[in-house]
Amino acid sequence: LPRLAEHYAIEMRVHLTKAIVDGYQPAPDMLVEYAIADCRRLALEFGIPFLDKADLPPTEFRAGLSDAVAASAGSDAFSGELFEALEIYWRGDTLAAAQISKSAPRRGAANALIEVSQDLQSRLGHYNSAMLHYAGEWYWGVDRLHYLTDRLDALGISKSRSPDLHLQSIRQSTRISLPVRPPTAAKSLPSIEYFHSFRSPYSYLALHSTFEIADAYGIDVRIRPVLPMVMRGMAVPGPKLLYIVKDANREARRRGIPFGKIADPVGRGAERCLAVFLYAESEKRGREFVLHAGRAIWSEAVDVSSDKGMRQVTHRCGLFWPDVKKAMQGDDWRATIEGNRESMMRDGSWGVPTVRLGDLVLWGQDRDWMLARHIEELCDTGDGILV
């Protein structure tokens, strides 16, 4: 963030907030564990020190650090002190965290500041932490930073004619380079397991890049569908759902994937898709079905809960309609789908899309570049890979 403020002629206002747990984080304990693992990988790629002084952050001093930072709220020193506290906390510097925590003039001072910040964020239309907001649009973490920098570049408000090397390196790190032909070493790799929900726009978007990566390396993709979160007893509040759809639309435009006319398949539509998928798999048409069903749901507003809609999708896949109807009448699919959910949860993920390749587990459609990087590393025998 300091580099962003230095490179562009912008005014940056930093707010101390916290992520809302109730309803917005369906598996908070799992999220904490996964987030640390994910941030370790990101920090390694971006060259940022992360938990290099301890295995875990000093959570016992989190409240004290927040109170110490809150003491400078409203002053020019606030953002600098907040950035310093964040670095200390997420590098695992227990000694420094203890010292700053003791310096807090008033215990509980952060609570009032956080409440004000949360109220502002809610009025602006969001609920999560690590969010940037500019002129009506939200940008989450480093994964959406390129949208903001593109917007600022288009406005011509850069202070320098040369790009900021640090900001540029983040963009470069997340680019995918694929081999012109599958390397020999890829033949020994296991299948990519892809946990998918027909109600998840991110699942639909990530299918395309996952298949592209797998095809480039000659690796099979095993689609493992699960029920939508709301059909598994996990809440998806309105503001979260609205942001997801807006963000997915933005991502779809960037990737050139059809998106926008939506028919929510929750309930009967999702169940029918799951049943038909297993039939499609038995006919070697699983890949075709998830792609066509996704396009129908997320870009053509096809109602897959109806026979007319489902017939439209399955016709494109070359599936026999009488057999499709028979598949939708049974309940045999439920055990397989539940097994997929259990497997995903055992690996430390609760949401989709989740990708597993051996011991690597990635959550989110914006980790496709990390999957490609991991496969490249597994295939690198020292002779290099032609990309």
Label each region the model flagged.
Residues A27, G136, T184, F198, ...:
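Conserved aromatic-histidine-acidic binding/catalytic patches
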Residues H15, A135, F195-S197, R224, ...:
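Generic beta-strand/beta-sheet core signal
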Residues L1-I88, Y204-I297, G382-L386:
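Structural alpha/beta surface segment adjacent to cysteine/selenocysteine redox centers
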Residues A185-S188, G269:
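Short, flexible turn/loop "capping" segments at secondary-structure junctions
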Residues L1-E6, E84-R181, S191, L205-I213, ...:
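C-terminal cap of thioredoxin/glutaredoxin-like
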Residues D55-P58, S103, F195-R199, A263-G267, ...:
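Conserved strand-turn element in the central/C-terminal portion of the radical SAM core barrel
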Residues K187-Y202:
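Short active-site neighborhood of thiol/selenol oxidoreductases, capturing the structured segment around
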